Amino acid sequence: MAKILIVEDNPDNMKLFRAVITIRGHQVVGLPGGEQLLETMRAETPSIVLLDIQLPGEDGFQLLKKLQAALADALPPVVALTAHAMSGDEAKALDAGFTGYLTKPIDVGTFASTVEAFIPPA
């Protein structure tokens, strides 16, 4: 069982993401924004982080930079969650250091397989 940290401000999206992940036997830690992200990362040590790009306050790119600076080599895979599906958006996210990229609304099968692909073997 992996621990997955989800940073998502939309309660409906969080509910769906949590359901898809927990039905596969994984634990979810959810945050509605990035204010508690660093301390939650240190306390929970998740296997993977799903980080919404558009959050109130600091966006996903700003939060990723903070994580990279604070955790460096200890940073788990961080997958971008975004409604941005324009040409070049995925490349921009991957260039910034995101490990993966998922667009919303999600396809449940793609979402699940992407999350599973980034969970390290037990």
Model segments located where?
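Short amphipathic alpha-helix used as the core "switch/output" element in two-component signaling
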Residues: 39, 61-74
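C-terminal output helix
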Residues: 106-115
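Two-component/phosphorelay signaling modules centered on CheY-like receiver
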Residues: 11-29
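Acidic catalytic/metal-coordinating carboxylates
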Residues: 12, 33, 59-65
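Active-site residues of response regulator receiver
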Residues: 52, 82
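Conserved acidic carboxylate
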Residues: 8
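The feature encodes the CheY-like receiver
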Residues: 56, 86, 104
